[in-house]
Regions:
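C-terminal catalytic histidine-bearing segment of alpha/beta-hydrolase fold enzymes
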Residues: 83, 112-116, 125-212
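Hydrolases whose catalytic domains are alpha/beta-hydrolase-1, hotdog thioesterase
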Residues: 45-49
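Short beta-strand immediately N-terminal to the catalytic nucleophile in serine-hydrolase-like folds
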Residues: 36-38, 63, 83
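A conserved short beta-strand
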Residues: 55-67, 78-79
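Short beta-strand/loop motif that positions the catalytic acidic residue
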Residues: 82-84, 88
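Acidic catalytic loop of the alpha/beta-hydrolase fold
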Residues: 88-91, 167-169
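Gly/Ser-rich "nucleophile elbow"/oxyanion-hole loop immediately N-terminal to the catalytic nucleophile
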Residues: 1-41, 51, 56, 131
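Extracellular/periplasmic catalytic domains that process cell-envelope and extracellular macromolecules
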Residues: 28-29, 37, 41, 52-55, ...
Length: 214
């Protein structure tokens, strides 16, 4: 989706679509309930799949990154949820400026400097033809979930903000045995963000997406 993959025109979307289609052919898969998720650049990839492969995916829920690719004419609104730590030290909550050196496709894109978690939510609300103001779906001492639920295709848009989380908004630390990985501490079990995202995803399937409904 991004970084060297985008610069070198690697067809990540085409590859993932082929993997999905092959899996459907070989296994008993409910093709109405195919979802995409990811963390950091993986979240950017998941949102690119939402934009470019909305005919395949029923919903997307991902962690700690924004849509960094241009919108496409073939996009049909699907539900989107992005989870972001307010204290994210890599992909800032207010902008992607610290991510730009690592994503060469963003170097000449001025709007890349402007995108933050809230802006990303509003951009998806525009893509999904949402109306009305921002709603608060959940608010407590640890996190909030806000967004839009009056959208085309019933394609709600949600932003989950974890107030004390950094770049790793998951419950557990990123213990991959490396110095960099060990610096990405999770919420220590205080916020089960994966479960919340999964609960969001399973509410949606292709059969429930009805164009023009709110």
């Amino acid at each position: 989706c991004c970084a060297h993959s985008a610069k070198n025109d690697v067809d990540d979307v085409g590859f993932i679509e082929r993997v999905v289609n092959f899996t459907i052919e070989m296994h008993n898969v409910d093709s109405d309930r195919i979802y995409a998720s990811g963390w950091s650049n993986g979240c950017a990839m998941a949102q690119r799949l939402a934009m470019e492969s909305s005919h395949i995916f029923a919903a997307v829920g991902c962690m700690a990154m924004y849509l960094v690719n241009d919108p496409t004419e073939q996009y049909s609104p699907i539900p989107i949820m992005e989870v972001h730590g307010f204290l994210d030290q890599i992909v800032l909550y207010e902008s992607t400026i610290l991510s730009i050196p690592f994503n060469e496709d963003m170097w000449t894109e001025p709007e890349a400097y402007e995108t933050g978690a809230v802006e990303n939510m509003f951009e998806w609300a525009g893509h999904n033809d949402c109306s009305g103001g921002v709603k608060t779906f959940e608010m407590n001492a640890l996190y909030s979930i806000q967004g839009f639920d009056e959208c085309a295709n019933n394609a709600t848009v949600q932003l989950m903000t974890i107030f004390a989380a950094q770049h790793n908004p998951y419950s557990n630390d990123n213990d991959d045995g490396t110095l960099i990985g060990s610096s990405f501490i999770g919420t220590q079990g205080l916020v089960e963000s994966s479960e919340i995202v999964w609960d969001f995803l399973i509410l949606h399937n292709k059969s429930n997406l009805s164009v023009g409904s709110f």
